Amino acid sequence: MEVTLQLNCSNIDFNNVCEILKRVGMGYFDGEVHKKAFENSHSVVFAFHEEQMIGFGRAISDGAYEAAVYDIAVVPEYQGNGVGKLIMESIIQRLSHCNIILFASPGKEPFYQKLNFRKLKTGMAIFVREEQMHSAGFTE
């Protein structure tokens, strides 16, 4: 399967980004909010198969030594084919000089561990949607 990666937001349908996030069970907002988030990110990756968006991800960074990965999603029927790995490798390559953190969806930790991510012992967060994050298994 041939996958093409796009490393910018040109001609991206952010309503489709919302639909993919819904399909994979991740949090989502309206298209304009996601457009703002991706356009203001340090690194973005959109994966396409035959001109159809099948996945994406992004990272925010200070560009010096810290970065955080967000919104890694692959359409369910394309999961398990290396698409997520391609997206993550593209992001990691551009941030190789940085410490990189992320929130893994519960159950997806092994995927990130294969990419050399390790669980944090002291990670903490303040969430706008605290109850939702707790019920989804992100917080104690």
Regions found by a protein language model. Name each.
Residues 29-73:
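A conserved beta-strand-loop-helix scaffold within acyl/acetyltransferase catalytic domains
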Residues 93-106:
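Conserved GNAT acetyl-CoA-binding A-motif
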Residues 1-32, 123, 133-140:
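Short amphipathic alpha-helix that is part of the acyltransferase structural core
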Residues 101-103, 113, 118-136:
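Conserved catalytic-core motifs of GNAT/GCN5-like acyltransferases
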Residues 78, 82-87:
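Conserved acetyl-CoA pyrophosphate-binding loop and the N-cap/start of the following alpha-helix
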